[in-house]
Amino acid sequence: MGHQDTKLGIPFLLAFVLLTCLAPPAWCVASTAMSRPNAGAGPTPVNIYIYVADIFDVSGSEQAFDADVVLVAEWRDPNLAGKWTERQSARLEDVWEPRLLLVNQRGTSALLPQRVEIEPDGLVRYRQRWSGSFTARMDLRDFPLDRQRFHVQVVSLGYSRDEVYLIPDPEGKRSRRAEKLSITDWTLGPTRMEIADFETAPGMKALAGVQLVWEGKRQFGCYGVQVILPLIMIVLMGWTALWIAPSMVMPRMSVSITTMLTLIAYRFALGRLVPNLPYLTRFDYFTLGSTILIFVVLLFVAATAYFVERNKTTLAERINRWVRLAFPVVFGAVLILIWRV
């Protein structure tokens, strides 16, 4: 009886195997296409296209920019060629894929499902859109007249260039950025694709990678009106102390000290614009020069008060007159030296 059950079970087992092979694409793909295409014939070529759909913000204090980035990757898998007569869709984990990773992403979210399209000739196409923050190493010495270099770098995780050859946009037409962007305080230049392998650690084999690169220039108008102009007005407020008669000691001291404290508070309020840096920016030099200039005015105000108290009013007025004339000349020189392009 048991022998007959075994005979009856064999046809059912064969039928199950046959149905498995004729199942939907995801089933068959998983069983036949998990090995790297052309593994014995050199590196597998993968075409990479990167499109920056939008840029929302550039943060100097965080050394990052917020953007929407679209990635398209295409490669040919001979194991999948000829299996279907029409385009098929499959899960990403059911086919071999180059394990693409955004190197400089910081807290991005994938917006599309992890799927691929398979053409009848074996062409596999993967699309994904990421939204979030990307790191950007910035040189802020010229802030806020600085130019920066931005990039989005993609690598093949676990594969060197000997195994996977990432080709940056062979046609040179599909990798670019959108013409209209949300960001308003930067002027961005054209993009270009380039090979950029990623070294995970010193001495380790570099991962195959490419990147989309573009440069940007900060628009000075916004900072000139909202930051620099108010600071100039604060400095000129300190100059008014020199237009008060040297005999009016308390009003002169009050204006000078108030200007000094306002400058210090203003500098702390604007500290969020840039990170803590081992060097001074143009803006730092400007605030430092302005603070020193107001401090010198404060010293001269104190000196003239000393001479007035000792009945040397003529000397105090002479000193005050020369300092009052020299102030705009020195301040103008500071402006020219620091803000010259």
Label for each model-derived stretch:
Residues 9-14, 323, 327:
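Sec-dependent signal peptide hydrophobic core
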Residues 1-7, 17-20:
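Short, low-complexity, charge-dense intrinsically disordered segments
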Residues 29-79, 272, 279-341:
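Intrinsically disordered, low-complexity peripheral segments of secretory-pathway and membrane proteins
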Residues 11-25:
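Bacterial N-terminal signal peptides
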Residues 211-330:
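Channel- or pocket-lining gating/hinge segments that regulate access to a cavity or pore
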Residues 163-165, 190, 268-269, 336-341:
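C-terminal ends of transmembrane alpha-helices
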Residues 6-10, 217:
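Short, Lys/Arg-rich cytosolic juxtamembrane segment immediately N-terminal
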Residues 29-215:
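Soluble non-transmembrane domains of integral membrane proteins
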